[in-house]
């Protein structure tokens, strides 16, 4: 999250007249992330203070956004702990603000767990599987917009910034993934709505009173799309289950996440066979996007672009893993 579009408390107070949320008590920009303008919003209504998240969308359009917002509502209605969009008085969950689409969602409890252990990863795996199953009857369709077609489209824009070794890595890995995506095995993998960006900072944990942490929920669904469930798992594992310095997978955390996921939605033999391919796909997706954001940035207050070398390192690790001599952690 970031702040590209600034907005005053008075402007929000006028905008909120279309909602039944009461009076604005605080509006505070959120610095993390790089896609939309996000704010913590506190209101008071009938003597009660409530907290929300206001998002102004910088890239997504009014036509694109219903997929994401209605997916969040769909999952929340089925007991998955995700932010629920708040409708205005006319029932709409998307309204213009400063000429851009904007929405208000409930604020989840807790804080991000940036140094997760195996138990945190198990909770994430369990909820991710339940989220995948809960989304099976979601009627709207939209592909993951940051998948192979986007990698190919972005490749010529970022190649000039890379050295010879990086250019070769990018071109060879896109070719590898194109062949994988065209395969019969890939076509047969289970699919449905996926988060596609489930990093440590997109989940919240709260203390349960006994010193343990309970998963408060997943948020930031604005990269979601219909994709292979295994891709969603790989993206998640590539962040939650690694040593940040080296990019290596931690076996205990990886197996905790995968086993918890498998207990809810059993993973198949075909998914096991292509686990390394999907880990590579997940690493490639974020290497490409971080290169793009780093070298072709947009202006924004509080913008904090991520270092692209992190996912380059992860991708090289995944490519270099030899399943015969050093199998990647699995269930």
Swiss-Prot record:
Top-level EC class: transferase
Keywords from the named record: Amino-acid biosynthesis, ATP-binding, Kinase, Nucleotide-binding, Threonine biosynthesis, Transferase
Pathway(s) it belongs to: Amino-acid biosynthesis; L-threonine biosynthesis; L-threonine from L-aspartate: step 4/5
EC number: 2.7.1.39
GO biological process, alphabetically ordered: threonine biosynthetic process
MF terms (GO), sorted A to Z: ATP binding; homoserine kinase activity
Reactions performed catalytically: L-homoserine + ATP = O-phospho-L-homoserine + ADP + H(+)
InterPro entries to which the protein is assigned, alphabetical: Aminoglycoside_PTrfase, Homoserine_kinase_II, Kinase-like_dom_sf, Pseudomonas-type_ThrB
Pfam families found in the cross-reference section: APH
Family assignment from sequence similarity: Belongs to the pseudomonas-type ThrB family.
Protein's recorded name: Homoserine kinase
């Amino acid at each position: 999250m970031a702040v590209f579009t600034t907005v005053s408390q008075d402007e929000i107070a006028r905008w909120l007249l279309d909602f039944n949320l009461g009076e604005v008590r605080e509006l505070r920009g959120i610095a993390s992330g790089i896609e939309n303008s996000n704010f913590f919003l506190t209101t008071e209504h009938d003597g009660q203070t409530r907290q929300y998240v206001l998002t102004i969308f910088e890239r997504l359009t009014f036509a694109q956004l219903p997929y994401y917002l209605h997916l969040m509502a769909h999952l929340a209605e089925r007991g998955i702990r995700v932010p629920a969009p708040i409708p205005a008085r006319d029932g709409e969950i998307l309204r213009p603000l400063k000429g851009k689409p904007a929405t208000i969602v409930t604020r989840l409890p807790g804080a991000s767990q940036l140094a997760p252990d195996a138990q945190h990863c198990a909770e994430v795996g369990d909820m991710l599987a339940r989220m995948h199953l809960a989304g099976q009857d979601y009627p709207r369709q939209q592909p993951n917009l940051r998948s192979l077609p986007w990698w190919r489209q972005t490749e010529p824009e970022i190649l000039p910034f890379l050295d010879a070794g990086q250019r070769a890595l990018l071109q060879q890995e896109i070719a590898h993934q194109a062949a994988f995506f065209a395969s019969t095995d890939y076509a047969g993998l289970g699919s449905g709505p996926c988060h596609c960006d489930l990093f440590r900072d997109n989940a919240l944990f709260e203390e349960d009173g006994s010193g343990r942490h309970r998963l408060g929920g997943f948020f930031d669904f604005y990269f979601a799309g219909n994709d292979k469930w295994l891709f969603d798992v790989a993206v998640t594992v590539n962040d939650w289950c690694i040593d940040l310095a080296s990019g290596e997978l931690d076996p205990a955390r990886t197996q905790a996440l995968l086993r918890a996921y498998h207990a809810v939605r059993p993973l198949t033999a075909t998914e096991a066979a292509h686990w390394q391919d999907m880990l590579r796909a997940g690493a490639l997706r974020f290497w490409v996007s971080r290169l793009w954001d780093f070298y072709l940035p947009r202006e924004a207050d509080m913008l904090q672009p991520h270092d692209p070398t992190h996912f380059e390192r992860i991708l090289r690790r995944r490519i270099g893993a030899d399943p015969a001599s050093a199998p990647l952690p699995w269930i």
